[in-house]
Amino acid sequence: MMRTQCLLGLRTFVAFAAKLWSFFIYLLRRQIRTVIQYQTVRYDILPLSPLSRNRLAQVKRKILVLDLDETLIHSHHDGVLRPTVRPGTPPDFILKVVIDKHPVRFFVHKRPHVDFFLEVVSQWYELVVFTASMEIYGSAVADKLDNSRSILKRRYYRQHCTLELGSYIKDLSVVHSDLSSIVILDNSPGAYRSHPDNAIPIKSWFSDPSDTALLNLLPMLDALRFTADVRSVLSRNLHQHRLW
């Protein structure tokens, strides 16, 4: 009898210790992600010279169109864990939305350095969100990324896309009629099929905590705002992913 009680007590202790260890690992991974997110971030925004200020004053302020999924964030919903997300990786935030009268929870992971990226480029461009996702989901994600900064006020969703052969195409003329001043950042070449000369390609992101793709784009985006027509630069086969 005593032996049975000892075994039960030992099993209870082992189960409790396992749960405690899992919780510790969860907290450790979350802390590591936070450190990685911010430890290498640096991009010096130096004051413009009089010549640069004059040059910038002669061109229109550009519009940077931003995709969400696999460009700025990655998400998965209840019961679905894609193999690209490491088990136990904590989400940055959880969204609860109702789709077709069914409540769904989305676990959202932010691409490394996305907050810093948005903070910097919002000083250079008018930012516009254009996602092929449903508005009820895309709007909630954009709200979280905006974080009350009012930098992601203009938004376009699935209903603003064109469906062609099973793919959602983003028509940039919906955003602005002057395509010389629009840049789109999207991981899906099919999304900007109609405007390849306005696109900056970026690799799809799912879970790599060491990813620096957004940081790597800052020098280019900094320079691109001085051009009279962004297509004069972006038309040089960048949409073929040869340089990325």
Swiss-Prot record:
Q: Any idea what this protein is called?
A: CTD nuclear envelope phosphatase 1
User: Species lineage, top-down?
Assistant: Eukaryota, Metazoa, Chordata, Craniata, Vertebrata
**Stored Gene3D superfamilies:** HAD superfamily/HAD-like
Q: What does this protein do?
A: Serine/threonine protein phosphatase forming with CNEP1R1 an active phosphatase complex that dephosphorylates and may activate LPIN1 and LPIN2. LPIN1 and LPIN2 are phosphatidate phosphatases that catalyze the conversion of phosphatidic acid to diacylglycerol and control the metabolism of fatty acids at different levels. May indirectly modulate the lipid composition of nuclear and/or endoplasmic reticulum membranes and be required for proper nuclear membrane morphology and/or dynamics. May also indirectly regulate the production of lipid droplets and triacylglycerol.
Q: In which tissues is it expressed?
A: Muscle specific with lower expression in other metabolic tissues.
Bilayer-crossing residues are 7-29
Q: How does it assemble?
A: Interacts with CNEP1R1; the complex dephosphorylates LPIN1 and LPIN2.
Compartment list: Endoplasmic reticulum membrane; Nucleus membrane
GO MF, any single term: phosphoprotein phosphatase activity
State the SMART domains in the record: CPDc
Q: What is its EC number?
A: 3.1.3.16
An annotated GO BP? positive regulation of canonical Wnt signaling pathway
Q: Which residues form the FCP1 homology domain?
A: 57-224
Q: Is Transmembrane tagged as a keyword?
A: yes
| InterPro entries for this protein | Dullard_phosphatase, FCP1_dom, HAD-like_sf, HAD_sf, TIM50
What GO cellular component is one of the record's annotations?
Answer: nuclear envelope
Task: Report the family membership.
Answer: Belongs to the dullard family.
Instruction: List the catalytic activities from the record.
Output: O-phospho-L-seryl-[protein] + H2O = L-seryl-[protein] + phosphate; O-phospho-L-threonyl-[protein] + H2O = L-threonyl-[protein] + phosphate
What PANTHER family does the record point to?
DULLARD PROTEIN PHOSPHATASE (PTHR12210)
